[in-house]
């Protein structure tokens, strides 16, 4: 079972889309790997401009499918970005791109004691 870090960005929170996204079931440190990119300062300013709704999702290979492509224009309908986004710079949600990055990003935002062990009985009927 894979885990990934997911954050609804300030534009998604301000637009009141947290509930809609949920139906799909330290910004500077988080984006440190992008520090040499020309858009880094603007990205940090944007990610600090308002509240961020952070969470960890778990599933088997479904996270990218649910989020959609980074560019909303390339995202399929039925994905979060395909349904709710119109601009690559304001694509409302961040999702870890690899399992390794997910572990690092989850560690930046959450402490181990903040997780609750929850054994969902339906998983045995859904996943082999």
Swiss-Prot record:
SMART domains to which the protein is assigned, alphabetical: NDK
Name this polypeptide is given: Nucleoside diphosphate kinase B
Cofactor(s) it depends on: Mg(2+)
CDD domains: NDPk_I
Any one Pfam family match given in the protein's UniProt record, by short name: NDK
Role according to the record: Major role in the synthesis of nucleoside triphosphates other than ATP.
Residues with the N-acetylmethionine modification: 1
Active-site residues per Swiss-Prot or TrEMBL entry: 94 (pros-phosphohistidine intermediate)
EC number: 2.7.4.6
Subcellular location(s) per record: Cytoplasm; Nucleus; Cell projection, Lamellipodium; Cell projection, Ruffle
One of the GO BP terms on file: nucleotide metabolic process
Single Gene Ontology MF annotation: nucleoside diphosphate kinase activity
Species this chain originates from: Merluccius hubbsi (Argentine hake)
Alphabetically ordered keywords of this record: Acetylation, ATP-binding, Cell cycle, Cell projection, Cytoplasm, Kinase, Magnesium, Metal-binding, Nucleotide metabolism, Nucleotide-binding, Nucleus, Phosphoprotein, Transferase
Cellular component GO terms held in the UniProt record: cytoplasm; lamellipodium; nucleus; ruffle
